[in-house]
């Protein structure tokens, strides 16, 4: 079996350690919660990942994970306890303790039943580079054993062991239990859950039911109880819930958009189908009208074929009825034209009469002039003859006029 070695990362710097402790203090309500269920464990895991992101934001060159940050805090806490135990042994078990760092004091100040450590400046200040180097050297050494054969590899069967050079801490990730060797006499105590061990790292005498007032209880199935609905003091809990809600809303909107797209396509297909149905309806309507016209045409042809004699009889009777009426009308029309011609002829005769009258007067004047040169007997004879001729002519014209226009 071939062992694959991983390159060891660099130690945590002073700024990374200080940032780590500050972020843990901000999230202590979640990290050190004594409730154990799926929801709390998930919230703890996300809290450690957020702390790792804050540490990586410093830009020290190493990308820390949530597990590495968690292990670093455990090592730092164990180192502080070891120094405190050593100081107790050297001082003969007196109540005087060596002063710890300011960040350790700030974390320990949150407890109720343990007094705070001394606040004076000391050589154990975390800002001292020597102490930081000493704490960094006591970091856990990671050894990962992997099998080369892929058939013999199983996901949950790999083991990760962490050995501490000072305390002899051994972590078995598969069994999820931690063994501590606090003294050289090999006294061991076992904690079944790793998350519960975190609650014992910081001294805290509060019971399970003595949680912060702002932190609502979480029931067995991971749902918030309706007893305490006060807003959380820490905003990251609300942020996590809002992120999950936004993700669900985003998925719902995506599904809704797909549904609307399918509905739009369905409506388009339905519109096309209706358009084809309208065209088919119009075509059938035109065909119906054409058949109606053909039917009327055939009916007329049948009627003309069956009743030709009736039509002929009707035409003859109509002619016989209209014939006498036409003759009378023609007669009246001819009479009217005849009267019109007679009237014109009378006008011509009247014009002739006037003309003759003028001629008579002229002749009378001429005779009057010739009386002086012709004897009286001859003149009298000629005048009498002319008067007789004129009288006969005038009487003839008058008789003709009376015969043409009676009563005039």
UniProtKB/Swiss-Prot annotation:
Alphabetical UniProt keywords? Coiled coil
Quote the InterPro entries the UniProt record gives. MSANTD4 (IPR026162), Myb_DNA-bind_5 (IPR028002)
Coiled coil (UniProt feature): 236-367
Q: Which residues form the Myb-like domain?
A: 4-77
Domain of life, per the record?
Eukaryota
Has the keyword Coiled coil been applied to this entry? Answer: yes
Matches recorded under Pfam families = Myb_DNA-bind_5 (PF13873)
* The name this protein goes by in its record: Myb/SANT-like DNA-binding domain-containing protein 4
* Species: Xenopus tropicalis (Western clawed frog)
**Gene name as annotated:** msantd4
